[in-house]
Curated annotation (Swiss-Prot):
One of its GO terms (biological process) is protein import. Part of the Tol-Pal system, which plays a role in outer membrane invagination during cell division and is important for maintaining outer membrane integrity. InterPro entries: 6-blade_b-propeller_TolB-like, PD40, Tol-Pal_TolB, TolB_N. Transmembrane segments: none annotated. Belongs to the TolB family. The lineage of its organism: Bacteria, Pseudomonadati, Pseudomonadota, Gammaproteobacteria, Thiotrichales. SUPFAM superfamilies: TolB, N-terminal domain, Tricorn protease N-terminal domain. The keyword 4Fe-4S does not apply. Gene3D superfamilies: TolB, C-terminal domain, TolB, N-terminal domain. Residues 1-21 form the signal peptide. Keywords: Cell cycle, Cell division, Periplasm, Signal. GO terms for cellular component: periplasmic space. This is Tol-Pal system protein TolB. The keyword ATP-binding does not apply. The gene is tolB.
Amino acid sequence: MKKVIYTIVGFVFMWSTSVYADLTIQIDQSSDNAVPIALVPFEWKGAQLHPPQNITSIVGNDLLRSGKFKAVDEAKLPSRPKTLDDIDFYQWKQLGVDNLLMGRITEEANGTYQIEMRFVDLLRKEQVIGKRWSGISKSLLRQVAHKMSDLIYEELTGIRGAFNTRMAYVTVRNVKGKKQYSLEVADSDGYNSQPILRSSLPIMSPSWSPDGQHLAYVSFENGRSQIVLQSLDGKSRQIIAKFKGINGAPAWSPDGKKLALTLSKDGSADVYIMDMKTRKLRRLTRNWAIETEAVWAPNGHSLFFNSDRRGQPQIFQVFLDTGEMRRISYVGRYNANPAISPDGRYVAMVHANGGFHIAVLDLYNEDFNILTKTYLDESPTFSPNGEMILYAMNQGGQGKLAVVSVNSNVTQILSVQEGEVRSPSWGPYLPR
């Protein structure tokens, strides 16, 4: 392993609005089975010609990204109803659409906005969702649109939507011939990006706390790897692991009381657990091999990690109460970088099969499916509802992020205008 010694340290904490552009999204594939939904442009009552945000466009893109739904082309809408009484149900039936979204945006006297949504089941001829938000600032209009998407998704699937969530990732840019790393947080669609830390040295492996208030990540700011705990409000930042050798791969326990991490302070790279209150360590693996990238099962009773103890990287599970260990990946010679679905049923991993792709193992029936066709895929992370997987990939020699829906063939690619994106981590649910 090549040893790199850094002699120049430079890092900046950032809490203001991002000076960088948001991520841009490209829908690479679409699902033939996506259910059409009519999204009627919202009625606008305000001083300007158009509302500050196109709510239906945001909702439409959210639903398209799920792989389950698609918006009817606006030009094909037979009418633009504002109330339930305006709807000609026979007319919409001829279009083959079962659901319709309509609403209103009203500019309030103090410069904030009131947003109303009505979601209609055209078959039952009734409104199934009615919601109003008042006192909404311009900066929060996109968040309200994501909340609408969540409500619609849950109404139609029975599964809570995960559009009103955030993701953390690392960007790498060349600034005056030198690499600049930035740890950033953005909405699930790549908008509203905010830099958390900017450094001239690498930043890796961000991991969200279960309450969404902190990030643990790996920094090299003191010339060697160390694990940092940082609050998103900028009020606290602590170095919690700076042992000799490797300090890496932090992962929060489901209750937020512990952190799994990889350390080599005792020789080989092994998985440890740190009590976040006492900072005491428990060594979980003892092997000459490299044991790393541990993630917690949702019940907190076991961890999944990758190890090359059999000669090639494979995924193992270790139970905390007994120390029992078992191998779970058997398809192919290379499986690494595990991620666990929120219900504990699926393990996503990087699988080598003529390239590195994201695959999913069903722990219930042992079905193994390769989900992606992109290049040099790594770092899978599930959405909070388990319906989508965010991961890093390479396109044209540039690092980008991508999201694949678990049960369809829809892939979206997220990139920055300049530089690369890597090390994604999908955050927990935000308050409804």
